[in-house]
């Protein structure tokens, strides 16, 4: 799990979720807010997704957040 700030000063957490068929989702939740966003990661497996998340800077997380869709 990673915490970061968006360009408006909002505080977010990003976490990984193993989905069906080997897919990995990046899940975003705003700290103190409601709703959850998700984005499928283009990684081969969960381990690779963990490495991506650990190595991503805040700019990469903000870019993924901008591409994320509401859950549900």
Where are these regions (language model features)?
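Acidic, low-complexity intrinsically disordered segments
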Residues: 34-72
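Intrinsically disordered, low-complexity regions enriched in Ser/Pro/Gly/Gln/His and often acidic
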Residues: 4-5, 21, 45, 64
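Residue-level signal for well-ordered alpha-helical segments
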Residues: 3-5, 30, 38, 42
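Short, surface-exposed, low-complexity cationic segments
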Residues: 17-36
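Negatively charged, low-complexity tracts enriched in Asp/Glu with abundant Ser/Thr
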Residues: 1-13
């Amino acid at each position: 799990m990673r915490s970061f700030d968006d360009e408006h000063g909002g505080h977010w957490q990003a976490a990984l979720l193993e989905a069906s068929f080997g897919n990995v989702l990046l899940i975003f939740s705003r700290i103190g807010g409601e709703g959850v966003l998700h984005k499928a990661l283009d990684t081969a497996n969960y381990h690779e997704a963990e490495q991506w998340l650990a190595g991503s800077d805040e700019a990469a997380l903000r870019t993924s957040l901008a591409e994320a869709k509401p859950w549900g």
